[in-house]
């Protein structure tokens, strides 16, 4: 319709709008697929196929019948309904369908006897649409055609179905006359049956105050004269569950509230009170309806019962049963003396039980037994079974529901019997008042049955509309083809098909006692998983969705089975059938013996389906008439028309489908005269040449080239969109004509204006040109005169200026020349004096410089001689040190070679033991392999049996087996890759052997370097002798004197050097002795760890490197000594020439010779060291050869073990794969357990087993050096396991704090950093540490224990966040600093690197975190959040108890201060004041270790004496239970919490978050309590609450912002509410003051609630002004219904994330933290002290 319409620029169209459904506008631009529309100033771009044409000639008040619309589409229908609704015309036809829009107000002009007279006998469609017209049409057809009629009224709850039904029955009663029946008219009885059924079958719902909770079909019988001769009422699916369950703000059935509002003598007889005292009624806060008096309705219902023939005795029995149901609801059950027995809870329950028994007129004990016990009849005997309290409560509710259902059925039967049916009547008019389509947030069995009814009626409706369309085409005698319409038969088959439908499956599930809603839902999923109308919600497990004609509806199956079962408990049946009250016993007649013996299961669904089928059979024999009731808005207020809401109802009611069916044929139908009048302009010649309307219409349509139209007898029938195309042609013709007219008019106006403008411009130009010429001539005259005047004036001025300038220049030149001569003379005098002064000063300066230079030269010479002597002494010292180092190195090498030989002998013995253990292990593995094969064979047999038994699920098992095979293939590929990795490692080991050959080559180079060293030493000695000889000759020749002090210093340095050499020799002897003592210990350690050979080789390599370094340093020093000797020779010559010393030279020569002899001794010592080095190298080569042999043997043994373990693991994996694929994906538990069983036997042959159960391969020897990264990582993974138990035993206790930092967290962190666990690829240490933190959650009641572990966990997490650095995606490790080459350099670097990490947060050590470390970090994060949540819930639980006591005390104090106390209020209305003893905070029995005192201020003298304990928080006596003491108990509890957290040094940001959420919880509890009851919204209550808030504010100020943060701001809702309560007088408060100044935070719902609750009837000044309340109420009506809750919600989320722990925790220096006392003396944890 929209796509085929021709849209041009200027056309008026409808465009979709999300707010108003459709808006109109004018087309501004048309593209190929999109158009631009101007909608009242707003430009909208829409697709061409999403717009509908608008009728520009639409009548202002709309049309009575929407089939007369030029464009029959959704926006046209909405516009027509809205125009008529605004004009109070609420009824509109759509063909034969009447649409009624509920006005929510009385319209007197539409009802009354006068209106009925107007419609009596009038043809359908002559008068305005009205239900009377529909009723009259049905009545006339029944009389004239002799066919029974039916009027179907449908619509949403609140759409006006009940009122429309009343009007229909009123009109039919008016038309049927007054045939008397036993003194009472039948029509009056039919009309009066409505209030009776409404009292017992209607209730208030969210959408309607008088919603029918049952379906009703009234059959009115007529005789041959058209008089009412009888009637029958049929009801469907009464909502039983409403008797026991009512949601707020709905109500139960009206009869309960009417009976409670009955006269006093009635309520006393039935022992009733207010509705709020009964559990079946007080589940909702709504007890009364606006504009409805329940007491008057009670009397009206009594009168209606009299009319329909229910006598007073029966009426008394009816209300006796209703009262008994109310008393049944107040019976509560508790556990009895036996374990699974139950009994009435208290005296109150026994009272209601007694009253209910009296009203039922049965035995009270029998009633109690029927509720608390069940009799199970077996073949031999009867067994009495006791019920628990929950089962007894369910039985009580079942009894109430079945009694009420029986009562309602009795009423319907009684009404039918009273009215009577005419057996001779052949024609009826049925009025169906049925519930409309329902879709709520929670849809149960009732909605399922209601929507099934609507599906049935919709199918009937579609078929009927299609038939009417057929009749219209046949009447006009046009050619038409079949019209396709939606057939919802597939939905009906889905629901009611037997077998296989949803109802059939539900009945089947109800017949099995063990069936639950879960099994029922799974059965539905399996049966209808491929059905296009059935779906399963993604996030639900038991819900299902059905695609109805009106939309998708999701049903919850929780109560389907219970609501579908229609049974009466045998005990209840027997009890009530034997009642002394005849009315009660008539409700439960005794069952026939045959039916009781052979009872067949009957369900509500099956009964309802049968009733529905009977209804449709009745409707099929009648001619239907349809009335669709529409609710214009959800506010239930007049004059509000919501387009989207109405459009949804029209779709659900099938109106739009009827329109679609109409549009599928020929929706546009115009009479000939109207068609020609509208479109004559397209072809004027057709109307001029012919007066035949039919012929003219055909010519007109042929000219516009329209296809597919039909010409009927009286009308033109157009297809969908053809009317828009005709309007488009008409708009083009009108537009073209308008443009021609506009062009001619504009041409005439423009020409006329141009001629006038031309004449005027000619005159103006002549005048202007004359004026311009005159002005130009005058200007030329003035310019000529001015030039002559200027010439004369300039000549005179120039002459005078020249004369003055000449005289001035002569005067100035004279003065300047004189001044220059004087200046020149003065300069010459100054220059002569300056030369004289400079010559004297330069002479003096040269003399002084010469004196200073001479003195400095003498001083420099003396200092230089001292420097030369010291340099020589330093060289001698260095030579002595190098000699000692060589001796030490040689001794160590000898000792290590001896140790290596002894270790080799031990290794041979160990290899023999390994071979024996290997053979034993192979035998064990073979036995295990045999067992596994047997298990495999048994498993296969079991599997084959299961497959044969479970052939129905063969497909699923094949899929699982396919997944298992894929997993096995993947595991096999992983094992093959692991085998390849092991082969690569073996190749690396062989490369390691080649490395020993490289070491031998390096040893040869060492020999060469030692020989070169010897040569250089000899050369240095030779040079030294030459220098000494030259010095002696110079001394003899020139008689120099050596500085005595320098020689003395040289001697002392020489003595020190000797002492140093002797001390080094003593140290070498001591090291030899220690080595002899420690060698046995090293031998035993070799037995424990096979990898010791790697350490020996690495030590040898390090020693080799050290020797190289020593040789290099000696060469460097020798070179320096050679250079120094040359320099000294030259310096000596200079000294001998410059100065002459006066000391005796002979003595000095002897000392020099003595020093030379000592130097020779040192050279001899060096040569002996070289010999020892040669011997050490030989021993090293032999050790290398032995190590190579040992490595080969170890590799062979490890290869055999690894192959056996690999085959073992593969077999175990196959068995585990066949047992469960899911278990393999999570963790290879079987392989892990098997590997751990084998690990003690082979622990000495390799690394320990990993977490996943695979054996870690032998660490490969790197290609170049033993100290590579992979080798060290394997070492660090094995090292700390033996120390973890000691660590865990220590930190699992409360080891306290040091300097305010947790010792346990820092100890764990230091150990993990020391052991390099964070860099390990696989480790089980984290799995052993995590349970330590998990143990803190086990004791959830100990706040002190939880706070201690929260501090430790958060601190450790903080350190990990600062330390761990995740590896880059490439996996390359960061660049490391260069490694020193010498042995001592590497040792010192190792000491520095393995020391305890610097824990200052400014320089936290960064490490590359592996996957186990990152997983450990995530686990710590989860524990921090869990501990925080547990502590918060403990605090909330205690605060809730204290607040309950506080609120109770406030209420009691306000009741004491009031003048009158209401004695009728039951104790149940009071807020329950829980004993704080139940939820008091439990203090830990353990005390923290001594902590350093902090300088924090304690709020309100925070001390341990003030902190509440279990005993201190018990329920106080009535004398102490005052508001002040209650608030004080809250303050004391907050003090206790703060002290606990401060003692445990909980991070400040966590403390602030905790108090913030605690105060938020206090705010929610106080604020909700104020808004829930009227007695709390008083000035006295506000003053008392304000006093308590002042106490909390004082506590916050004393506790300081450091701990509580902005917690005080969380009480803003309660504070503002209290301010409003205590403000006096309230009548002067304006709306702006209320919403801006006083209560800016509160919402409109909350303000309206407070203002309405704090009303005082006696004093108007205490009330808020009505204007303010009306403004708030107006805002409430405009706001969304979803924002109607005035209560606050508690926030239970975690208020921080992991990143906040790192950013919010204050940076601390952890360097000064003391270690735990238990680890202080342990030598393995000495690094903690560093």
From Swiss-Prot:
Myosin motor domain location: 61-731
Biased composition (Basic and acidic residues): 1475-1508
Domain IQ: 757-786, 782-811, 831-850, 853-882
Myosin N-terminal SH3-like domain segment(s): 8-56
Gene3D superfamilies associated with the record: 1.10.10.820, 1.20.5.190, 1.20.58.530, 6.20.240.20, Kinesin motor domain, Myosin VI head, motor domain, U50 subdomain
GO molecular function, one term: cytoskeletal motor activity
InterPro entries: Dilute_dom, IQ_motif_EF-hand-BS, Kinesin_motor_dom_sf, Myosin_head_motor_dom-like, Myosin_N, MyosinXI_CBD, MYSc_Myo11, P-loop_NTPase
Record note on quaternary structure: Homodimer.
Protein name: Myosin-7
Taxonomic source organism: Arabidopsis thaliana (Mouse-ear cress)
Taxonomic path: Eukaryota, Viridiplantae, Streptophyta, Embryophyta, Tracheophyta
Encoding gene (name): XI-A
């Amino acid at each position: 319709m929209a796509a085929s319409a021709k849209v041009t620029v200027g056309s008026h169209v409808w465009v979709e709008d999300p707010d108003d459904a459709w808006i109109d506008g004018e087309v501004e631009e048309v593209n190929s697929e999109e158009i631009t529309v101007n909608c009242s100033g707003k430009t909208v771009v829409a697709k061409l196929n999403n717009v509908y044409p608008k009728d520009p000639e639409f009548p202002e008040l709309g049309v009575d019948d929407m089939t007369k619309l030029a464009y029959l589409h959704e926006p046209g229908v909405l516009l027509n309904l809205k125009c008529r609704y605004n004009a109070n015309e609420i009824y509109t036809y759509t063909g034969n369908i009447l649409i009624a829009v509920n006005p929510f107000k009385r319209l007197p002009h539409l009802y009354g006897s006068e209106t009925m007279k107007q419609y009596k006998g009038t043809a359908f469609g002559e008068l305005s649409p009205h239900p009377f017209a529909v009723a009259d049409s049905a009545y006339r057809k029944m009389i004239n055609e002799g066919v029974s009629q039916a009027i179907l009224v449908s619509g949403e709850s609140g759409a006006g179905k009940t009122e429309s039904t009343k009007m229909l029955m009123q009109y039919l009663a008016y038309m049927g006359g007054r045939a008397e029946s036993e003194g009472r008219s039948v029509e009056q009885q039919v009309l009066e049956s409505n209030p009776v059924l409404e009292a017992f079958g209607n209730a208030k719902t969210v959408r309607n105050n008088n919603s029918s909770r049952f379906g009703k079909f009234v059959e009115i019988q007529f005789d041959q004269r058209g008089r009412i001769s009888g009637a029958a009422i049929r009801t469907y699916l009464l909502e039983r569950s409403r008797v026991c369950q009512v949601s707020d703000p709905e109500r139960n059935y009206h009869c309960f509230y009417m009976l409670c509002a009955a006269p006093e003598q009635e309520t006393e007889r039935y022992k009733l009170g207010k509705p709020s005292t009964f559990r079946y009624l007080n589940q909702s806060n709504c007890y009364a309806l606006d504009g409805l008096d329940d007491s008057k309705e009670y009397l009206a219902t009594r009168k209606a019962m009299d009319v329909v023939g229910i006598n007073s005795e029966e009426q008394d029995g009816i209300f006796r049963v209703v009262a008994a149901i109310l008393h049944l609801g107040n019976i509560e059950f508790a556990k009895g003396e036996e374990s699974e027995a139950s009994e009435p809870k208290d005296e109150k329950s026994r009272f209601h039980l007694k009253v209910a028994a009296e009203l039922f007129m049965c035995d009270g004990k029998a009633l109690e037994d029927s509720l608390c016990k069940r009799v199970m009849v077996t073949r031999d005997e009867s067994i009495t079974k006791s019920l628990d309290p929950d089962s007894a409560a369910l039985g009580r509710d079942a009894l109430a529901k079945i009694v009420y259902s029986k009562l309602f059925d009795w009423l319907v039967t009684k009404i039918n019997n009273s009215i009577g049916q005419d057996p001779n009547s052949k024609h009826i008019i049925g009025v169906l008042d049925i519930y409309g389509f329902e879709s709520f947030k929670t849809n149960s069995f009732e909605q399922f049955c209601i929507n099934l009814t609507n599906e049935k009626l919709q199918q009937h409706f579609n078929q009927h509309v299609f038939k009417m369309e057929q009749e219209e085409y046949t009447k006009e005698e046009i050619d038409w083809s079949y019209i396709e319409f939606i057939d919802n038969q597939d939905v009906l088959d889905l629901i009611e098909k037997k077998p296989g439908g949803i109802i059939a499956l539900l009945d089947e599930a109800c017949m099995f006692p063990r069936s639950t809603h879960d099994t029922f839902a799974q059965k539905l999923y399996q049966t209808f998983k491929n059905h296009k109308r059935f779906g399963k919600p993604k996030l639900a497990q038991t819900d299902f969705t059905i695609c109805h004609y009106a939309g998708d509806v999701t049903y919850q199956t929780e109560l389907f089975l219970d609501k579908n079962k229609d049974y009466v408990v045998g005990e209840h049946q027997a009890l009530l059938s034997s009642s002394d009250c005849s009315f009660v016993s008539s409700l439960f007649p005794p069952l026939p013996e045959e039916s009781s013996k052979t009872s067949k299961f009957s369900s509500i669904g099956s009964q309802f389906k049968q009733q529905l089928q009977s209804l449709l059979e009745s409707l099929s024999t009648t001619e239907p008439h349809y009335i669709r009731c529409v609710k214009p808005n959800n506010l239930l207020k007049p004059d509000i028309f919501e387009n989207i809401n109405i459009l949804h109802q029209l779709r659900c009611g099938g109106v739009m489908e009827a329109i679609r069916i109409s549009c599928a044929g020929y929706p546009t139908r115009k009479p000939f005269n109207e068609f020609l009048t509208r479109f004559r302009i397209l072809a004027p010649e057709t109307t001029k040449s012919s007066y035949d309307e039919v012929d003219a219409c055909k010519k007109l349509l042929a000219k516009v080239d329209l296809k597919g139209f039909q010409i009927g007898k009286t009308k033109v029938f157009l297809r969908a969109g053809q009317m828009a195309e005709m309007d488009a042609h008409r708009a083009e013709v009108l537009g073209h004509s308008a443009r021609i007219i506009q062009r001619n008019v504009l041409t005439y106006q423009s020409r006329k204006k141009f001629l006038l403008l031309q004449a005027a411009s000619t005159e103006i130009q002549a005048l202007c040109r004359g004026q311009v010429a005159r002005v130009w001539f005058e200007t030329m005259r003035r310019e000529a005169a001015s030039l002559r005047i200027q010439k004369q004036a300039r000549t005179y001025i120039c002459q005078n200026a020249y004369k003055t300038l000449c005289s001035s220049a002569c005067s100035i030149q004279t003065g300047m020349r004189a001044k220059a001569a004087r200046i020149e003379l003065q300069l010459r005098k100054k220059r002569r004096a300056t030369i004289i002064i400079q010559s004297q000063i330069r002479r003096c300066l040269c003399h002084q410089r010469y004196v200073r230079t001479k003195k400095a030269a003498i001083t420099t010479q003396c200092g230089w001689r001292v420097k030369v002597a010291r340099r020589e002494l330093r060289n001698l010292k260095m030579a002595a040190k190098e000699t000692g180092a060589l001796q030490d190195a040689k001794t160590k090498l000898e000792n290590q070679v001896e140790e290596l030989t002894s270790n080799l002998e031990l290794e041979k013995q160990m290899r023999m033991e390994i071979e024996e253990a290997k053979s034993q292990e192979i035998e064990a593995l073979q036995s295990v392999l045999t067992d596994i094969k047997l298990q495999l064979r048994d498993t296969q047999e079991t599997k084959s049996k299961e497959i044969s038994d479970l052939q129905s699920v063969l497909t699923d098992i094949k899929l699982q087996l396919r997944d298992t095979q894929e997993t096995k293939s993947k595991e096999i590929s992983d094992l093959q890759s692991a085998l390849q990795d092991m082969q690569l490692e073996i190749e690396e080991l062989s490369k390691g052997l080649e490395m020993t050959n490289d070491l031998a080559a390096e040893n040869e180079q060492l020999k060469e370097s030692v020989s070169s060293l010897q040569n250089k030493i000899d050369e240095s000695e030779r040079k030294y002798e030459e220098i000494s000889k030259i010095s002696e000759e110079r001394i003899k020749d020139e008689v120099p004197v050596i500085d005595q002090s320098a020689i003395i210093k040289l001697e002392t340095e020489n003595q020190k050097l000797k002492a140093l050499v002797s001390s080094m020799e003593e140290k070498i002897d001591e090291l030899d002795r220690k080595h002899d003592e420690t060698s046995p210990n090293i031998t035993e350690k070799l037995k424990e760890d096979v990898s010791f050979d790697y350490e020996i080789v690495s030590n040898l390599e390090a020693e080799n490197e050290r020797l190289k370094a020593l040789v290099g340093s000696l060469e460097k020093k020798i070179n320096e000594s050679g250079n120094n000797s040359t320099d000294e020779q030259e310096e000596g010559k200079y000294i001998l020439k410059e100065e002459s010393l006066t000391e005796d030279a002979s003595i000095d020569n002897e000392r020099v010779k003595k020093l030379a002899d000592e130097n020779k001794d040192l050279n001899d010592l060096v040569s002996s060291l070289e010999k020892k080095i040669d011997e050490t190298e030989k021993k090293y080569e032999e050790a290398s050869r032995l190590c190579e042999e040992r490595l080969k043997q170890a590799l062979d043994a490890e290869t055999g073990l690894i192959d056996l373990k690999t085959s073992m693991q593969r077999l175990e994996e196959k068995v585990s794969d066949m047992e469960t694929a899911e278990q393999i994906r999570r963790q290879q538990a079987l392989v892990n357990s098997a590997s751990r069983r084998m690990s003690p036997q082979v622990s000495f042959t390799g690394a320990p087993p990993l977490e996943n159960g695979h054996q870690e391969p032998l660490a490969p020897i790197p290609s170049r050096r033993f100290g590579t990264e992979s080798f060290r990582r394997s070492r660090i993974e094995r090292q700390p396991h033996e120390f973890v138990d000691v660590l865990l035993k220590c930190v699992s206790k409360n080891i306290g704090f040091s300097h305010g930092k947790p010792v346990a967290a820092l100890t764990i962190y230091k150990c993990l950093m020391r052991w390099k666990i964070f860099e390990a690829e696989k480790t089980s240490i984290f799995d052993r540490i995590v349970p330590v933190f998990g143990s803190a959650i086990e004791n959830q009641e100990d706040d002190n224990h939880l706070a201690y572990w929260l501090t430790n966990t958060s601190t450790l997490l903080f350190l990990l966040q600062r330390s761990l650095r995740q590896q880059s995606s490439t996996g390359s490790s960061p660049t490391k600093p260069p490694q020193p080459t010498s042995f001592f350099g590497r040792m010192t670097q190792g000491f520095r690197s393995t020391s305890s990490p610097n824990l200052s947060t400014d320089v936290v050590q960064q490490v590359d975190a592996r996957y186990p470390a990152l997983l450990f970090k995530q686990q710590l994060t989860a524990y921090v959040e869990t501990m925080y949540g547990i502590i918060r819930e403990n605090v909330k639980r205690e605060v809730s108890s204290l607040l309950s006591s506080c609120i109770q005390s406030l209420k009691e104090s306000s009741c004491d201060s009031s003048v009158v106390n209401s004695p009728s209020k039951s104790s149940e209305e009071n807020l329950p004041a829980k004993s704080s003893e139940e939820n008091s905070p439990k203090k830990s029995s353990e005390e923290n270790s001594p902590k350093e005192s902090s300088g924090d201020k304690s709020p309100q003298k925070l001390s341990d004496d003030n902190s509440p304990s279990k005993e201190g928080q018990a329920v106080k006596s009535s004398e102490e239970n005052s508001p002040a003491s209650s608030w004080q108990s809250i303050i004391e509890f907050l003090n206790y919490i703060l002290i606990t957290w401060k003692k445990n040094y909980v991070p400040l940001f966590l403390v602030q978050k905790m108090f913030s959420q605690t105060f938020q919880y206090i705010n929610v509890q106080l604020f909700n309590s104020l808004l829930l009851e009227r007695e709390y919204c008083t000035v006295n209550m506000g003053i008392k609450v304000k006093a308590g808030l002042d106490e909390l504010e004082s506590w916050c100020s004393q506790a300081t912002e450091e701990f509580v943060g902005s917690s005080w701001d969380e009480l803003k809702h309660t504070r503002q509410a209290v301010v409003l309560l205590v403000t006096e007088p309230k009548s002067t408060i304006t709306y702006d003051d209320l919403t801006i100044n006083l209560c800016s935070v509160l919402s409109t719902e909350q303000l309206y609630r407070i203002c309405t609750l704090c009303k005082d009837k006696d004093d108007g000044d205490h009330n808020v002004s009505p204007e303010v309340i009306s403004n708030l109420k107006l805002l409430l009506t405009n706001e969304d219904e979803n924002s109607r809750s005035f209560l606050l919600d508690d926030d239970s989320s975690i208020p921080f994330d992991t990143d906040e722990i790192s950013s919010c925790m204050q940076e601390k220096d952890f360097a000064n933290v003391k270690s735990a006392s238990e680890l202080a003396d342990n030598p393995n944890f000495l690094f903690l002290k560093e």
